Amino acid sequence: MNTDSLALIKQSIKTIPDYPKAGIMFRDVTSLLEDHTAYQTAMKLLVERYKDSGFTKVVGTESRGFLFGAPLALELGVGFVPVRKPGKLPRETISESYELEYGHDTLEIHVDAIKAGDKVLVIDDLLATGGTIEATVKLIRRLGGDVAHAAFVISLPDLGGEKRLQAMGLEICKLCEFEGD
């Protein structure tokens, strides 16, 4: 990937100290979305990376994964599947719970959104601990989908998400990374 393009993306992401709590350096992807050139560059890089990969579906996680997953699916000519928090999807769903730092959360997917043999790309805005994507991958695999790739705009490698997802057999694509948390 083009070094200048990757630098533009990283520079467009604002860092908010002590948000949402003291000691956290929040990486705000919405500042990238506000910058037409940076957003367009991110999408072009993702399309270029995956245009010949043979995916049949792109799955995005709630909610910022939708902002990258849906336009990517359109450009790749495949369907987009949202993975959402409980009670947000109208048809029959399956769910997967996962652990957070203090508690747990649950994600859902429509049971008919992924067919056996679908080749799926998972995408989200940011990879931290990997819990959200791990739960998403489990949902896809339970429905018979083949998922071996996950894409992110931002990765925080010090939080262990990359290693966690690689242990699940996923190849990781990231447009930028920030050290620390």
Curated annotation (Swiss-Prot):
Listed name of the protein: Adenine phosphoribosyltransferase
Compartments, as annotated in UniProt: Cytoplasm
Keywords annotated in UniProt: Cytoplasm, Glycosyltransferase, Purine salvage, Transferase
UniProt key word Cytoplasm: yes
GO terms under cellular component: cytosol
Pathway: Purine metabolism; AMP biosynthesis via salvage pathway; AMP from adenine: step 1/1
Native species: Shewanella amazonensis (strain ATCC BAA-1098 / SB2B)
Any matching Pfam family: Pribosyltran
PROSITE patterns with a match to the protein in the record: PUR_PYR_PR_TRANSFER (PS00103)
One MF term in the entry's GO annotations: adenine phosphoribosyltransferase activity
InterPro entries cross-referenced by the UniProt entry: Ade_phspho_trans, Adenine_PRTase, PRibTrfase_dom, PRTase-like
PANTHER family hit by this protein: ADENINE PHOSPHORIBOSYLTRANSFERASE, PHOSPHORIBOSYLTRANSFERASE DOMAIN-CONTAINING PROTEIN
HAMAP family documented for this protein: Aden_phosphoribosyltr
Known catalytic reactions: AMP + diphosphate = 5-phospho-alpha-D-ribose 1-diphosphate + adenine
GO biological process: adenine salvage; AMP salvage; purine ribonucleoside salvage
EC number: 2.4.2.7
Role: Catalyzes a salvage reaction resulting in the formation of AMP, that is energically less costly than de novo synthesis.
Gene: apt
Cross-referenced NCBIfam families: apt, PRK02304.1-1, PRK02304.1-2, PRK02304.1-3, PRK02304.1-5
Family assignment from sequence similarity: Belongs to the purine/pyrimidine phosphoribosyltransferase family.
Disulfide bond among keywords: no
Main location: cytoplasm
Subunit structure: Homodimer.
